[in-house]
Amino acid sequence: MSVPIKFVWFPQIIGFVRNTLGAGKCDLVMGTVAGDEVMETTSPYYYTSYVIVYRKDAGWNFTNFDDPRLKPLHFGVIAGTPPGNLLVRHGLMVNAKPYQLTVDTRYESPSQEMIQDIADAKIDAGLLWGPLAGYYVRSGHLPLQVTVLASEPQAPRMAYHIAMGVRASAPQWRRRINAAVQKHHDEITAILTEYGVPLLDEQDAPLVK
C-alpha cells in the first residue's frame, strides 16, 4: 500500500478504542470482531473460534461437553468469555479455574498462563480464544491438542469473523484496506496458519485438521 508502518501498543482495557483509534494514535486496530459496535470495521480477513486445549497424553479426546469423562476434570476459562457459559450449561463450572479477562497485557498474559498450566498438569484443559491458544501452543512447541468449540443452540456463539477497526470518518481508508485484504488473502491465510491460528470455513469446519 506504500504507506509507512508504525506499531502502537496499548492494553486492551476499558477505553481502548477511545485512547487509540479515537485519539488519533493509530489508524487501524487489528483483530477486532467484524461489526464491532464501537468502531467501523473492514471486511473480515479470517474466521475463527474459541477452542478447548488439553494434553495429547490426557487419555481422552474431546467430542462434546456431554462426555461423562469430563465431569471430574479441572477446566481453565477466561472470566466473562463465551465458553464459560458452556461450562455452566453442562455442570462443569464447579471445578473451573478462572483467569482474568481485563489485564494490562504489557505485564500479564492470562491466556499464556493458562496454556502453561495445562502443559504443567495444573489443570486438565482450558477454554480460550483460538488465535491466542494456537499461538502459544505453536510458539512453545507444547504437546497440546487444540480443538475448535462448536456453538450450541441458545448459547453464546463460539465462532467470529475477524476484521480490522477504522475510524468512521475514514471511508476511503477502509476501502483501501478492504482492497489490500482481498488482494493478499492467500498470503494472510498462510501467515495465520504459520502462527497456529485455527481457521474455519463458513460451515464452521476447520480448514486445517
Predicted regions and their residues:
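Ligand-binding clefts/hinges and TM-proximal coupling segments of bilobed small-molecule sensing domains
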Residues: P4, F10, P82-V103, N178-K209
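Solvent-exposed coil/turn segments that connect beta secondary-structure elements
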Residues: V33-G35, Y47, R55-A58, G80-T81, ...
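Periplasmic-binding protein-like
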Residues: Y47-D57, R138-V181, P198-K209
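Solvent-exposed, polar/charged alpha-helical surfaces in well-ordered, non-transmembrane soluble domains
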Residues: N19, A23, N85-R89, Q112, ...
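Extracytoplasmic
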Residues: S2, F16, A23-G24, Y47-S49, ...
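Extracytoplasmic small-molecule ligand-binding "clamshell" domains
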Residues: M1-T32, D36-V38, D104-E108, E194-Y195
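A ligand-binding cleft/hinge motif common to bilobed small-molecule-binding domains
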Residues: I14-F16, G22, M30-E40, R89, ...
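Flexible hinge/capping segments at coil-to-helix
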Residues: R55-F75, R89-H90, V94
